[in-house]
């Protein structure tokens, strides 16, 4: 993903357009090499996948700590970092400790909500996730008939020793 892992210090913004571009490159490779495709995505990767792969022949999605409602997250960032919508519109981009807020990206989010999703999807959500509320995740799961698993005491990152087993068991039970 842009600005993640080995690309963390590269000059590539983590936004929907770069995310979709990367996922399209991956898709070209995957579709040529496999007949049955399952997708595993975490956090922002899940959000990008919802947009990049919505019309792709994928058997099942596995989303770990997915960002399902980017508008919700952006509004939380407005609150966390004392930024207003008008200020973002005026400045176009505002740096925060988490990520750069962009007016163009915000407009994309507002103009492109996920309205249709009919691909079988399993979601693992940590009860201590602060990036998406349980209400957001439950609403998405109910609206689009997804299987929702909630890990008590897990955070967005699922990085504790006990989380490894939770995630491994969930993946094995979902495929």
Language model regions located:
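Aromatic pocket-lining residues of Rossmann-like dinucleotide-binding sites
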Residues: 52-53
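The alpha/beta-hydrolase serine catalytic core
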Residues: 57-139, 143-150, 154-158, 162-174
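Glycine-rich phosphate-binding loop signature in dinucleotide/nucleotide-binding domains
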Residues: 30-35, 117
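Gly/Ala-rich beta-loop-alpha elbow adjacent to hydrolase catalytic centers
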Residues: 40-49
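Alpha/beta-hydrolase active-site loop
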Residues: 13-32
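Conserved alpha/beta-hydrolase
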Residues: 1-9
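Short glycine-enriched, charge-decorated loop/helix-capping segments at active-site entrances
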Residues: 9-15, 78
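Short beta-strand immediately N-terminal to the catalytic nucleophile in serine-hydrolase-like folds
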Residues: 36-41, 64
């Amino acid at each position: 993903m842009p600005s993640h892992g080995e690309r963390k210090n590269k000059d590539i913004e983590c936004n929907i357009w770069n995310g979709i571009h990367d996922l399209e490159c991956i898709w070209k490779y995957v579709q040529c090499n496999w007949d049955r495709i399952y997708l595993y995505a975490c956090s922002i990767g899940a959000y990008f996948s919802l947009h990049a792969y919505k019309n792709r022949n994928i058997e099942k999605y596995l989303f770990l700590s997915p960002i399902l409602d980017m508008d919700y997250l952006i509004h939380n960032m407005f609150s966390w970092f004392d930024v207003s919508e008008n200020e973002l519109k005026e400045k176009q981009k505002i740096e925060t400790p988490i990520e750069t807020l962009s007016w163009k990206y915000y407009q994309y989010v507002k103009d492109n909500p996920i309205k249709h999703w009919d691909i079988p999807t399993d979601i693992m959500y940590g009860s201590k996730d602060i990036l998406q509320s349980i209400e957001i995740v439950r609403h998405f799961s109910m609206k689009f008939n997804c299987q929702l698993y909630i890990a008590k005491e897990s955070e967005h990152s699922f990085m504790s020793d006990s989380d490894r087993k939770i995630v491994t068991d969930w993946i094995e039970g979902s495929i």
